[in-house]
Amino acid sequence: MSFTAIAKVYDRFNDLETYEKWLDFTLSSTNTPPQKVLDVACGTGWFTQLLAPFCEQIDAFDLDEAMLEVARSEQGEQANIRYFQADMLELDALMTDYDMATCYADSLCFLQNEQQLQTALAHIAQRLKKGGLFLCDVWTPYQVGTAFDGFNYFDSDDEYALLWDSDVEGLTVSHYLTVFAKKGDLYERIDTTLTEKTYPLKVYRDALFQAGFSQVEVLVDYGQDVYHERRHKTADRWFFRCVK
């Protein structure tokens, strides 16, 4: 499973307006602008660049070097961003004292099992200073088990075409992506499979508390409403606002 094959077209077919909603959620979650931020699984850096004007320093990392190459190429004059390659399961112990950490775009769902989830959350918590804020989102079981079941999508422009199909097994969804990239009069076909897994809410809450967070708030609609089990049965994402 890798984003390498689709790094160059990731933003082209992504809903970039969603990143503005993540930014609003982030800024509304703190009373004072954060000085030092860790952006976990930053991808092509779209959210990182949106947040940069509101903080002093952002360290942003991703597992996929191809995604980071795109991020660096779009960085421009934002000198307060530092991109680097890293695995959220093996973070450098010297990276500490962050005011805030973010992990959006359901990135935690790409971890393979509960043990990896627990390890990643513990590493993130250890990077934060006491009272530091962690913001993230994950797919809900409804989204994975129902909304993604039989999902298919097609989009195209002058240079690329995207075919996207999803298969579901339990709370695991496999996304089969095919990109056709125009090369002169021909098209190059690029195939990749991305697998995501989610869990019942209790698993996430328990893992966050065990990782070292003292407060865990669960929200929906990009932080617009506190999650209520009966009222939000068809919510697509859970948003977590956590304090160390």
Task: Walk through the language-model features, giving the residues of each.
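C-terminal lobe and adjacent flexible extensions of AdoMet/dcAdoMet transferase-like proteins
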Residues: 201-244
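Residues lining the SAM
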Residues: 104-106
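SAM-dependent methyltransferase
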Residues: 135-205
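Class I SAM-dependent methyltransferase "Motif I" SAM/SAH-binding loop
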Residues: 41-45
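Class I SAM-dependent methyltransferase SAM/SAH-binding core
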Residues: 46-90
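Conserved class I S-adenosyl-L-methionine
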Residues: 1-35, 46
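A short acidic, Gly/Pro-enriched loop at the edge of an enzyme's catalytic core
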Residues: 93-100
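A short glycine-rich, Lys/Arg-flanked "PGG" loop and its adjoining helix->strand segment in the class I
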Residues: 118-130
